[in-house]
Structure formats: structure tokens, C-alpha cells
């Protein structure tokens, strides 16, 4: 009876400690994996945004509306892209892969804009983490990642004959690209499931090993 009581308490203590350690490990692993996947998506989104802006740069410089519109439509039709928009400094959408957006105004107090505006004035430079946002169109919709890329007034812009932008105007507009996170969220869920299965399996296996060791090294000697 005494041996069984000691063995039971010892087993319970070891299992409780193991459960706590493995649970903490699982939580941190899930969080780290999720953050790593999201950082990779943010990096990819930033590269896509820079590529799109560079690809449209020549057409914007020559104010070629048709080519800009065609380029944005082509990019917006890609499976990994949800929508591509370009709006001017005033917040009016002038190009979009969704034509119903064109001509509408963006709320500068919305999440996609507030990082660029401080008391109504856009800041000059933004880090990648400050240019991205994660949101849902509605509570039941999949998550989306959006990235904004300010279009700065370079010398080739304010010296071009077809443009009327003064040299003092720093930001001409913003390129906004949104990408679905459906695949990323699926990978996150799979990783979470794998970590949970590993944690549960480790706890069960450790419990069996501890029970056998306690029975062999504690219960049997005490009974003798």
C-alpha cells in the first residue's frame, strides 16, 4: 500500500511536470511556426509589390492609362493575388483589377492607410512590417494579407513632360496588393495538428515509461 502510494505520487509528479513542459513547448512551437510562415508570406508580398511597381514604372512615367490598366488586370488575375489597386495621394482609386473600385475613395482612417498618415500627413518611409496588414472582409471569410507600397516622386517623374507633379510632392500615390492566406492558414493548421499529435504521443509514451520504471524501481523494492 505504501509503495503504491509513493509510486502513484511520483508518477503523478513526473507526468504533471512533463505535461507542463511539453505544453509550453507546443505553444511556443505553434506560435513560432505561424510567425515564420507569415514572415515568409510578407517577404514574398513585398517582393511582388516591388516587382509590380517596377514593371508599371515605365507606363506610369508616360501616363499610359491603357497599359497600366492592362498590367494591373493581368497581375490581379493570378491565383495568388486577390486584388491590385492604385490610388492617388487624395485616396481616390485610379486603377484596380476590380473595375467597380475605380473612382471610389479610400478611407484614410482605415487599417490600410493609417500607418501612412499622421494627423493627415503621409510619412516618408515605411518598413515592410508597417506596410502589411492581415484582415478579414467579414467574420466568416478567409484571412487576407495586404501590402501597401508608396509611389514616390522621383526626379524622372517631376521632370517628365507629361506630368505636372511639383518637385516638392514626395508621394504621388500608393500601390495596394491583397493576397489570400488560405494556403498559409492550411499549412499553419497542419503544423499545429502535427505538434499537438507529437505532444500527446510524447506525454502518453512518457507516462507508460515512468509507470514501468516506478513499478520496477519503487513498488517492487518496497513490497519486498
Please provide the spans of the model-predicted regions.
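Cytoplasmic juxtamembrane amphipathic helix immediately C-terminal to a transmembrane segment
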Residues: 34, 210-224
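Membrane-proximal amphipathic alpha-helices
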Residues: 13, 27-48, 57-68
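Extreme N-terminal signal-anchor transmembrane helix of membrane signaling/transducer proteins, especially
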Residues: 2-31, 198-206, 210-213
Amino acid at each position: 500500500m505504501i509503495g503504491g502510494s509513493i509510486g502513484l505520487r511520483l508518477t503523478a509528479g513526473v507526468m504533471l511536470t512533463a505535461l507542463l513542459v511539453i505544453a509550453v513547448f507546443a505553444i511556443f512551437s505553434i506560435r513560432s511556426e505561424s510567425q515564420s510562415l507569415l514572415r515568409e508570406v510578407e517577404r514574398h508580398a513585398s517582393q511582388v509589390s516591388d516587382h509590380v511597381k517596377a514593371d508599371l514604372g515605365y507606363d506610369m512615367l508616360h501616363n499610359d492609362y491603357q497599359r497600366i490598366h492592362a498590367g494591373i488586370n493581368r497581375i490581379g488575375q493570378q491565383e495568388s493575388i486577390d486584388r491590385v489597386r492604385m490610388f492617388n495621394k487624395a485616396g481616390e482609386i485610379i486603377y484596380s483589377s476590380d473595375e467597380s473600385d475605380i473612382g471610389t475613395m479610400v478611407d484614410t482612417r482605415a487599417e490600410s492607410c493609417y500607418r501612412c498618415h499622421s494627423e493627415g500627413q503621409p510619412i516618408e518611409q515605411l518598413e515592410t512590417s508597417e506596410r502589411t496588414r492581415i484582415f478579414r472582409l467579414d467574420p466568416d471569410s478567409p484571412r487576407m494579407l495586404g501590402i501597401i507600397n508608396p509611389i514616390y516622386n522621383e526626379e524622372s517623374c517631376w521632370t517628365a513632360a507629361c506630368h505636372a507633379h511639383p518637385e516638392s510632392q514626395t508621394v504621388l500615390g500608393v500601390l495596394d496588393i491583397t493576397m489570400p492566406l488560405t494556403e498559409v492558414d492550411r499549412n499553419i493548421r497542419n503544423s499545429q495538428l502535427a505538434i499537438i499529435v507529437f505532444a500527446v504521443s510524447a506525454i502518453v509514451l512518457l507516462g507508460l515509461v515512468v509507470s514501468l520504471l516506478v513499478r520496477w524501481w519503487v513498488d517492487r523494492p518496497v513490497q519486498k
